[in-house]
Amino acid sequence: MDNQRLILFIVFSFSLLLLWEAWQDKQAPAPATRPVAGAPAGSAAPTPSTALNAPAAAPAQTGFAKGARAVVETDVLRATIDANGGDLRELQLLGYRETEDKNRVFTLFEDSRTRPYLAQSGFVGGGLPTHRSTFELTPGTYRLTGGAARLEVPLVWNDAARGVRVEKTFIFTRGSHEVAVRTRVVNRGKEPLDLTPYYQFTRHGEAPRGESFFLYTYTGPAFYTDAKKFQKVPFTDIQDGSAEFEKTATNGWVGLVQHHFVAAWLPEESVKREYYARSLGEGLYSAGVILAEGQLAPGQQKTFTVPLYAGPQSQAVLEKAAPGLDLARDYGWLTPLAYPIFWSLEKIERLVGNWGWAIIILTILIKLALYPLSAAGYKSMAKMKKLTPRLQQLKETYGDDRAKLHQAMAEMYKTEKINPLGGCLPILIQIPVFIALYWVLLAAVEMRGAPWLGWITDLTAPDPWYILPIIMGVTSILQVKLNPQPMDPMQAKIMMIMPVAFTVMFVFFPAGLVLYWVVNNILSIAQQWAINKQVEGSGKPAPAKT
């Protein structure tokens, strides 16, 4: 197998791996209705109470009771807060559009019958409100207007008989996708209160609407601690009880990750906590964290705040929000290589003002940086192509005597000073760059809705007119033509089929990735053509010895 076939085979295998991951995700077993506990009994950290596992008394059409509602509008968010539970029931990100309908604002949290996704909080144990308690809330629309930097929406829960008051306040900040949830507990009673608040997400187990079958991206809970770092916990693992993650810590966060977006509760460091994930039945799951805030003596009060980030996976923003939150933007096993690639891409975009042109410029720069390596590979292929007639002659001479054929070929390579594998390593070194760039382009929410040229209005969506995939297919065929043809007719057919298969697959790939591939193909064709001419003009090789 020559170098070109090797690189095509590896990239084709990588593409098949992506398709396999997508198929596995689509074929995952439907969630059962049996709940699975997510936290071990007897743990030193606070444990979810059995009350939290009880089914909610709620209308059948939604699964969650509805109460008075406050609609909050800032410059970047539109949120709905419900007095029933004090939940954040709906959240729209005003700067982003839905994949299926560009006229609709992107919805992250959704209070629907079939696809609920909520942010909830409450207290473990009796005597304090949970996400099923009713709060006092002044309904209406709250707008962040004028020069105000922040907006507060207060909710109150009272137990007059026991002298306990809980104030939950949602704090919104201009220009930010972070919502602070401040809780103030006042104990005017005669007994101390155990403060073990929990913060969780409740979500359906399906992938977001509009996700491509051909491009698998992770959707599900994720936990981060200093000890275990970033841990994904698939819904299927939660369902069958095999979920593994760090349960207790004094740091970290819990989140729900999906393509381009993440929601995460970010408790402050040093507070003792327990993480949990469980199945609620009927296709619903919850993942959260319980904090140990200690006891509140009679006549005392205590205030604690937990930020909720719910927004795009913007690398710069995530890095500042919390340690390890930037890992929600998953680049896979090539993260160390992907980070500098995205850094370079972002710097170029700032200069040219267009992500499409930034991809083209970065592709050229990568090609120049790898030129010495790729030139060695292309030179080896050019020499092999020059020997193709002689190799064919040897095959005709020795027929099925493969031992003598291989011996004659080895002597020819030695005479012509050609190492048939000499170009493999340089080309193999380039493959991680392509894979890392693939993950960068797939994960970059900065390109969501970003246009390039004419018909390309969103670099993260497939080419609507299939122009780039067709160009990619044509250039891939030209590349095959420029390289030595396999002596085996079956291999030759496969080499011609692979570009067609690539074209079909890349119809469903993001336009930004296909744009990179097209530019890379064109540059590779130019480089290969020039090297072929150089080798062809270097003299005619001696005839084959038989």
From Swiss-Prot:
Keyword Cell inner membrane tagged: yes
UniProt keyword annotation of Translocase present: no
Keywords: Cell inner membrane, Cell membrane, Chaperone, Membrane, Protein transport, Transmembrane, Transmembrane helix, Transport
One BP annotation, GO: protein transport
Membrane topology: Multi-pass membrane protein
NCBIfam families in UniProt: PRK01318.1-3, PRK01318.1-4, yidC_nterm, yidC_oxa1_cterm
GO MF, one example: membrane insertase activity
Name of the protein this chain belongs to: Membrane protein insertase YidC
Lineage start: Bacteria, Pseudomonadati, Pseudomonadota, Betaproteobacteria, Nitrosomonadales
Bias (Low complexity) ranges: 37-56
